[in-house]
Amino acid sequence: MSLLIRSGPSLLTRTTKKTNTRQQSLVVRRKIRYFVGKKSYQEKTEQMKKTISLVIALISCLTIGAQEFQHYFTDATLRIDYTFTGNAKSQAIAVDELCKIPRWYGKRQRLAELPVEGNGQITVRDHRSQRVIYRNSFSTLFQEWLSYDEAKTSTKAFQNVFLVPYPKDTIDVTLDLKNNRRQTMATLTHTVAPADILIRRIGEKAVTPYETLQQAADTTRCIHIAYVAEGYTESEMPVFIDDCRTAMEALFAHEPFKSMRSRFNIVAVKATSEESGTSEPGRGIWKNTALHSNFNTFYSDRYLTTLHLKDLHDWLAGTPYEHIIVLVNTNNYGGGGILNSYNLSMTHHPAFKPVVVHEFGHSFAGLGDEYAYGKEEIPMYPHDIEPWEPNLTTLVDFNSKWADMVKEKTPVPTPQPATLGQPNAKKTHWETGAYEPAGYSQHGVYRPYPDCRMRTNENPEFCPVCQRAITRMINFYTDKQ
């Protein structure tokens, strides 16, 4: 990229000196003549013009993106803590607290674009012009809880934390929550003045100790991941670092992460717990840990999460992070992943590696679960609405998903291959199509491939559709095409 930027001015900058003009003319002619072949001089000239135009366009896009960020934001983070409250009938959003953190580790290009819709969006507008200057999408445990029967009879409140670049001038922040029909169910707009004396400054002192596990090739255009210790005591930190390396290598054993490894910057944050392990309410076990994680989320035995997002971000304040992977010191099976919130996984169960990668598929790329629970139906995806997840479809708008990857002769819906589920099954004849079940539903929701990391722990890789979705996400965050 830097070579292209340097070559631009030498070819395109005008000079008043005739000698320099003649030299530039010779350079251009030599460049043109380098494109050997039977093309005419005019064709070669046109080809060279197109090449130069592409270089100019690329440089312009990079420059405009950088100017946009520098015009509206400083190199710092505005952390906004919210409380989401309500039940199945009504929901509300309230601002809890504002914090300022040194440095900004999120995107600096494509600021107003969303790579996926998510179950909600945070939108930042310049207060004076009302121009959208930053957007991001997310999902939350609160919205998931609304789909359970408990939400029909009780009201609850959930913590949520969002990070946006710190503004230079006053901004309006809008938070929208969507239901499973992709309709807005709650919204809040509030104003933030960057000079507000009640914005708490954190992350400047007493930063949680951390180790850098991998440094990106370009730290200005990379994806920052922080592994966070949960349920590790002071004496167990060496075990945590080993677990981080295991999780990291498991992720980079999967394409497209493997091919794009240099775009990731990874640290291990040593959040120390008073007690080892995690809480297991189903067994009457409660532990005093850094993030207060627990099994039995929403009364599901293996659903391991934390509801204490403010504590999580307090531990992370001052460390280089955007995407969060919480590693829990337990040998019991469990985990969870929420888009642009966090990924949480047990570490000492035999399925640790596939689970931590699977959950990162949720939290990083917005991928949906491609399985169903036997005969149990969880009405997460209405069959008359196209899901926003890139690897799920109800066929309502299949063309917006992976229809372009399905061969013309492949039937849609697609029957399961006879070898699916068999040990050492040959996958050479497997094809991209639309397979049931998926999205916790036996019928009406479809996945792209017979098996995938988003479906089972046994499958060793992401399917072609998920790989494409992850590639697009990595390119989005690192501003690559």
Identify the residue ranges that each predicted region occupies.
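Active-site recognition of the HExxH zinc-binding catalytic motif
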Residues: 353-370
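Active-site-proximal segments of metallohydrolase catalytic domains
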Residues: 263-339
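Fold-level signature of zinc-dependent metallopeptidase catalytic domains
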Residues: 197-255, 268-278
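Solvent-exposed loop/turn segments at secondary-structure junctions
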Residues: 231-234, 272-276, 330-334, 350-352, ...
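Beta-strand-enriched, solvent-exposed domains that form extended recognition/catalytic surfaces
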Residues: 72-198
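Bacterial Sec-dependent N-terminal signal peptides
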Residues: 1-3, 7-8, 15, 25-70
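Short pre-active-site segment immediately N-terminal to the catalytic Zn-binding motif
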Residues: 239, 336-357
